[in-house]
């Protein structure tokens, strides 16, 4: 090669070329050339890139191993019987439901561990999402809230009746994942291992089914279709809260493969579908006949709700594809008067215990007469809202007392009787004796300073 000057196409320097080693890449037809210095820099960059890529893969593998180790610890610590024992501390009755959810959560964690320890392939384990049904105020949301608290995973509730088919005004199905994302503190990894509860799921049943609810709408089948891939496991894209959805908006991506979906609702009327399936006439089961008492009606409901099968859900208006992605059916019983009475006082976060602590902070001992507790339970049954209304009934009764007692620090006792609940009689405020003072101290509640923020309350059974 004769001596000539060539300009490097990358660094734009002129190079005197004696032979091919001075300019390793050169096309005389186009004049394209790369000098040896630029080639050296490119090779160095590629070596560094490979090294960084290798480190990233190694870090990812270490992270994957660390998460698998964390899952293993959770499984060893939270066997199904341990999960149920924890739920027993907060939830009265619902023994079968607590067992079903304990096993479902345990198996879900085992499935995730299996996926981390084995590369995804033909032998991967399918996800077992849950459908939970029972009357209003029987403990559906409370069960799931305490379950997520024990497992220390994010939990979010979304009202399924607010979801709309794509193209209609309302919330898209992706909002359920977005709610979980914010419940997880905007941590995508935590989001991808959380629990989503779709409440009021029965409200999106097809009206063409045997369910004739006026809240059902033919368009709700589109909502069910929109949930299919999300339930099975897919990458869901959504915009941040407050941002309008448009093509240029930045999106957040979450893989729902390891999110446990639980859908629930009252499914009003499904017991009649079950009754027809088991070939018992409406009259023999009491439907359409005169109801003798609320207790008889509840017993009939509980008897039938535990026999719900996938075909009953199809007749109710849930599409077959959705039912196939909800293999676990969990049913809850109606809470009778005795159960509501226990809920008032027995769980760790019982409403009465909460109010005892609140009043103790004002140097006041709270006492409920037995007939007062019974009156609260009876009123909740009359309202047909289950345990959900217990705290509200007590709040209404004690409003004036809680307004007046902070006026003085003198130790006192507040006594709630049945007349306070039923007739609106003002609760009695009495001096506190030595025994009462001792019991007040045993509550171990410190009076807050004016600048202190009140502690958050536990969730009441719902």
Task: Describe each PLM feature range.
Residues 2-28, 45, 49-93, 98-156, ...:
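AAA+ P-loop NTPase nucleotide-binding core of proteostasis motors
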Residues 12, 36-39:
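Cys/His-coordinated zinc-binding microdomains
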Residues 38, 42-46:
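Short, structured interface segments
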């Amino acid at each position: 090669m004769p001596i000539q000057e060539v300009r490097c196409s990358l660094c734009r320097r002129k190079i005197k070329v004696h032979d091919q080693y001075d300019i390793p890449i050169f096309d005389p037809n186009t004049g394209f050339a790369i000098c040896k210095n630029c080639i050296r820099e490119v090779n160095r960059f590629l070596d560094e890139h490979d090294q960084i890529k290798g480190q990233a893969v190694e870090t990812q593998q270490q992270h994957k191993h660390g998460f698998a180790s964390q899952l293993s610890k959770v499984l060893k610590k939270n066997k199904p019987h341990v999960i149920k024992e924890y739920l027993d501390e907060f939830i009265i009755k619902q023994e079968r439901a607590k067992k079903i959810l304990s096993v479902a959560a345990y198996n879900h964690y085992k499935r995730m561990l299996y996926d981390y320890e084995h590369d995804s392939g033909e032998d991967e384990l399918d996800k077992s999402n849950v459908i939970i049904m029972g009357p209003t105020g029987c403990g559906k949301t409370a069960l799931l809230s305490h379950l997520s608290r024990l497992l220390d995973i994010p939990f979010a509730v979304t009202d399924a009746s607010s979801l709309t088919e794509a193209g209609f005004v309302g919330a898209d199905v992706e909002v359920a994942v977005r709610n979980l994302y914010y419940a997880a503190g905007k941590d995508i990894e935590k989001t991808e291992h959380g629990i989503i509860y779709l409440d009021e799921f029965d409200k999106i049943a097809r009206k063409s089914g045997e369910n004739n609810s006026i809240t059902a709408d033919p368009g709700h089948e589109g909502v069910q279709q929109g949930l299919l891939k999300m339930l099975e496991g897919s990458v869901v894209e959504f915009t941040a809260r407050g941002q309008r959805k448009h093509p240029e908006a930045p999106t957040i991506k979450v893989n729902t493969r390891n999110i446990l979906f639980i859908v629930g609702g009252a499914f009003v009327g499904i017991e009649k579908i079950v009754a027809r399936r088991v070939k018992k006439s409406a009259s023999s089961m009491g439907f359409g006949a005169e109801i003798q008492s609320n207790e008889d009606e509840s017993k009939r409901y509980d008897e039938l709700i535990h026999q719900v099968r996938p075909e009953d859900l199809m007749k109710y208006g849930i599409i077959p594809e959705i039912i196939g992605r909800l293999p676990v059916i969990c049913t809850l019983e109606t809470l009778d008067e005795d159960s509501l009475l226990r809920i008032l006082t027995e769980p760790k976060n019982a409403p009465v215990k909460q109010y005892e602590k609140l009043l103790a902070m004002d140097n006041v001992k709270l006492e409920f007469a037995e007939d007062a507790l019974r009156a609260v339970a009876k009123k909740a049954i009359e309202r047909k809202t289950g345990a959900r209304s217990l705290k509200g009934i007590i709040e209404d009764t004690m409003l004036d007392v809680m307004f007046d007692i902070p006026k003085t620090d003198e130790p006192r006792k507040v006594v709630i009787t049945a007349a306070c609940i039923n007739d609106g009689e003002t609760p009695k405020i009495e001096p506190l004796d030595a025994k009462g003072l001792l019991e007040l101290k045993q509550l171990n509640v410190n009076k807050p300073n004016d600048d202190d923020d009140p502690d958050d309350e536990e969730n009441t059974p719902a």
